């Protein structure tokens, strides 16, 4: 099946053409980072307007780069949710319009489902496995028993880890988005220079909390006579990142042991973080388990990642009608398509 995928859940307008849920023929991502940087975060109204501006040229570019026409597209997968409602509506409206005009089967895919299956574009992982999804809006642990079969084990009770990175970067005067810059500066610092808390580290649940860590950074900065720079800034970034990674690793290890799983998948934008990738590799080596972390190009928001689930659903005859709408909130364990799959 040649599938067109469309993603507009936040601040990237993306489209991709993928064959048989594996072979990426094209993947186009138009980022709005520069647009939102001056506001220190994503402005929903601006994001929606930018999606409206870019959706048609992005889809056209994806088709051109793949060397296919709309007449050759056999299915359309689109991010239905969760995300910014106005942004989602742009992608869903485009997908429904193409499906109607060209009589192409359509399916809505969960954004997080895309992230946790993104690595399948490189190499499928046998089920069941544990999935850690870390991004600007999510920090979730799932047990995955098959495509469409997800059970949540733990989630953040406040800030997502990517949000904590961006807010900390703002406190440090690094601008938005600052996660990648903190990661780069951390590589030159000492992870033990500043003792930051590890929220919920010893809590029996598999939930996360990062708002307190962000507050701890603010408290530390208020005690300093000047804005940190140079080696001091590097140490602060390294110490913050060490705290984040320790919490993520400990909770992930606890989930693996609780569920008796031998395979781990890490996805989402924060999976680009070099410190986290290294920490998870160390965990996998120590526990002798299989680890999959997609290449960075598949970690951030993109449309190609939707094709794995989209192709599986459409191939099994699971499709949505034109009454399908975008939804800002949509728990992954309520996707409930697995009963229709072989």
From Swiss-Prot:
* CDD domains associated with the record: ASKHA_NBD_TsaD_bac (cd24133)
Q: Where does Fe cation bind?
A: 111, 115, 301
Keywords assigned by UniProt, alphabetized? Acyltransferase, Cytoplasm, Iron, Metal-binding, Transferase, tRNA processing
Q: What is its EC number?
A: 2.3.1.234
Biological process terms from the Gene Ontology for this record are: tRNA threonylcarbamoyladenosine modification
Q: What is this protein called?
A: tRNA N6-adenosine threonylcarbamoyltransferase
Job of this protein: Required for the formation of a threonylcarbamoyl group on adenosine at position 37 (t(6)A37) in tRNAs that read codons beginning with adenine. Is involved in the transfer of the threonylcarbamoyl moiety of threonylcarbamoyl-AMP (TC-AMP) to the N6 group of A37, together with TsaE and TsaB. TsaD likely plays a direct catalytic role in this reaction.
Gene behind this protein: tsaD
Recorded superkingdom: Bacteria
Naming one, the record's GO cellular component terms include: cytoplasm
Which catalysed reactions does the entry list for this protein? L-threonylcarbamoyladenylate + adenosine(37) in tRNA = N(6)-L-threonylcarbamoyladenosine(37) in tRNA + AMP + H(+)
Q: Where does substrate bind?
A: 133-137, 166, 179, 183, 273
- Location in or out of the cell: Cytoplasm
A GO molecular function term, named singly, is: iron ion binding
Q: Which cofactors is this protein said to need?
A: Fe(2+)
- Top-level enzyme category: transferase
Cofactor note from UniProt?
Binds 1 Fe(2+) ion per subunit.
Signal sequence bounds? none
Family of the protein in this entry: Belongs to the KAE1 / TsaD family.
